Amino acid sequence: MDTRTNGKPQRDANLEDVLERLKGGHILRYHTRPDCSDGQNVAAHTWRAMVILQTLWPDLSKNALLHLMYHDIAESRTGDIPATTKWDYDRLAVEVAKIEFKYNCELGVNFPVTDKEKDCCDIADKLELVFHCQRMYLRGNYLAGDIIVNGRDYLDHKYRGRPHYDIAKNVLIELLDNDLNPSE
């Protein structure tokens, strides 16, 4: 019996933990905007966001990667509530955050990160949204344009002036600097 983690035997009892954690990856994104989904689920989004995080900030801690890896896992309990809905309904956002925190604690996936790491994870998360929707846009799905603009504006308003945002800002400028920029 392997007892390397918390003295808990590594047998069938852990299968439930694995399955519960994997369940979050099956949640479909953009359910309120299915025209922009392209079938993307949380697992695909998270992998892409982690690639962005590790590429732009390769020296961040393992906890930062784990924080991002599990950032949407609670959606298997709450559903994927759009960020714009949470922005419009502050009390809802607070209650959902409580549910997500409790669920993450139950699963043991709350990883301590610095404020900078938390920012970088959020930036990578939103950059992935912009990359995904820009890909849709460039394939002729102009319905994704407003999501691109909202994502770009969110990042610029929230992180402008913070040194760790500069690299992401440059990526956004390069990504959106073409004749098909949805803000034009």
Q: Where are each of the predicted segments found?
A:
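Alpha-helical, largely C-terminal catalytic domains
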Residues: 1-184
